[in-house]
Amino acid sequence: MTRALAFALFVSLFITTNSYAQRFAASGHLASSQWSEFDGTDIGGGGRFTFMPTPTIGVEADLTWYPGEFPPDGIPFTGNRFEGLFGVTAGPRLAGFRPFAKAGGGFMKVSESSQPIVCVAIFPPPLSCVMAGGPTMAAFEFGGGVELLPTGHALLRLDVTDRVLKYPGPSLGANFETNDDGFWGHALRFTIGAGWRF
């Protein structure tokens, strides 16, 4: 009898907690990203799926596609890029909005150059020539943002983060610095979007 009562209590607590805590959101966003080693702004679009196990913690997957050649000025080394970032947000839900801090990790897949580029036959090769080969780079982001919750299930969201990319090596940088191994570069990433909570 005691086991049955304990089991029933456990199940009721689990169901009550989950019915209160489980929240999902799906949204689309416009992304504007900088690169630490190249000039120009990378513009893309994507989607985000969020699971909120508690009212203050969110677990999310953020996928973004950057369709244009990059860099926009000069000789492009890539035709498009695909980015996947997976992480957590933490912040209180207040009256009509939720400020949050966030951290995550993932990847940035750079496509090969859509047209041939001329590379000087030196070692190490220029970074743009290494990037033209289409590497997949480790990516991290740290920052924060705010969700606006105007009415019902709708949401508007703004994120500002420091995106950290692991550039491949060996390579020669724009200022002729030599990188024998891969190296990390930091740059601003900004997204704005809208979605639906359910």
Segment roles from a protein language model:
Residues 31-37, 66-73, 108-112, 164-172:
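Sequence/structural signature of outer-membrane beta-barrel proteins
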Residues 8-9, 19:
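Cleavable N-terminal signal peptides
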Residues 117, 165-166, 181:
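A beta-strand edge to alpha-helix "cap/lid" segment located at domain peripheries
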Residues 1-7:
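Bacterial N-terminal signal peptides that target proteins for export
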Residues 21-34, 101, 185-187:
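Transmembrane beta-strand segments of Gram-negative outer membrane beta-barrel proteins
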Residues 15-21:
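Sec/Tat signal peptide C-region and signal peptidase I cleavage site
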Residues 32-47, 135:
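Surface-exposed strand-loop-strand hairpins of Gram-negative outer-membrane beta-barrel proteins
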Residues 48-140, 148-157, 185-198:
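Gram-negative (and chloroplast) outer-membrane scaffold detector with strong preference
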